[in-house]
């Protein structure tokens, strides 16, 4: 079964991106993505 991982902006805490993975990663994922609320590229952390 695939797990749903939601990425949350580190600055404004808005939930912007969703990803589905078959396995849960061992470490926390940090991805540099564009945030609509901040209007810039920020770090996004995963939240299970």
UniProtKB/Swiss-Prot annotation:
GO terms for molecular function: structural constituent of ribosome. GO terms for biological process: translation. GO terms for cellular component: cytoplasm; ribonucleoprotein complex; ribosome. It comes from the Bacteria. Keywords: Ribonucleoprotein, Ribosomal protein. Belongs to the bacterial ribosomal protein bL33 family. This is Large ribosomal subunit protein bL33B.
């Amino acid at each position: 079964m695939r797990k749903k991982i939601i990425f949350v902006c580190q600055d404004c805490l808005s939930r912007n991106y969703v990803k589905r993975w078959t396995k849960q990663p061992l470490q926390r994922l940090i991805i540099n993505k564009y945030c609509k609320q901040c209007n810039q590229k920020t770090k996004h952390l995963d939240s299970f």
